[in-house]
Design a protein with these regions (language model features):
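Acidic, surface-exposed loops and disordered segments
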Residues: 1-243
Length: 243
């Protein structure tokens, strides 16, 4: 498949055939993830494949996964990981202050996200489906306990990968001109927002499954109605970060 066509046809898969991925295919996925760009080559991530049925069930419950975690061909947790760098600094009797700050944490988040998306693109190129699972952050303390995460790590999201048992319709993105800026930032006009709301209202009303009375603004108002996952700051402090 043409790469652009593949990217433009992306949808999240939430129903998987129960076939597990072969060791060879899983190794290819990991190699693909590692090939992504990394800031200063710090490679500030770890990828944990969760196979234990009890752990999968616990993650499914806290993430509200409805089957697309435990039924996937493989389930990975992508961890922003500065612990390995703390090991190096400690081994060489160097202070950890530069590792604990916001910039280092952002680097680890970016590195981890690039690795995950590179895996996702490769997975879809060989006919697999994927679904990012941000719901693992619903209980960061529980995730850290389940995965025995050390200091200077953060479980960023999960990634379910497997053989699709069904495919959702592609959601219309914002028009390119709404996200492309030249030389300076340009806020969206009310007309641009209204036009996209109408596009999304038509999409939600007309899709073949789970039709809804919704548009983009309604979705965003619901999403940002109140602060979410407010334990994140406390968890970051527990993990040794100092912002």
């Amino acid at each position: 498949m043409d790469l652009l066509k593949q990217l433009l046809s992306h949808t999240s898969v939430r129903k998987f055939a129960k076939d597990k991925l072969s060791p060879r295919l899983k190794n290819q996925l990991l190699c693909a993830a590692q090939s992504g760009s990394s800031s200063n080559f710090v490679q500030a991530y770890s990828i944990i494949e969760v196979t234990d049925p009890q752990k999968l069930a616990a993650i499914e419950k806290l993430a509200n996964g409805f089957g697309y975690i435990k039924d996937a061909g493989a389930f990975y947790v992508f961890v922003a990981d500065l612990n390995k760098h703390a090991q190096i600094l400690t081994q060489h009797q160097q202070p950890l202050e530069a590792l604990k700050n916001e910039e280092s944490f952002i680097v680890s988040v970016v590195d981890t996200t690039i690795a995950a998306q590179t895996m996702a693109v490769y997975a879809e190129s060989v006919g697999l489906g994927i679904c990012y699972i941000g719901g693992i952050r619903n209980d960061l303390f529980k995730m850290a306990e389940l995965l025995e995460l050390p200091e200077y790590t953060f479980p960023l999201f999960g990634l379910s990968v497997g053989y699709p048992a069904g495919k959702n319709e592609v959601k219309p993105r914002l028009p390119v001109e709404d996200i492309q800026h030249t030389d300076s930032y340009q806020p969206l006009s009310s007309q641009q927002i209204d036009a996209y709301d109408q596009l999304m209202e038509d999409y939600y009303a007309g899709r073949t499954t789970n039709a809804a009375d919704a548009d983009w603004s309604k979705k965003m108002l619901a999403h940002f109605h109140e602060p979410r996952r407010t334990h994140t700051t406390e968890f970051l402090k527990k993990q040794g970060f100092e912002f």
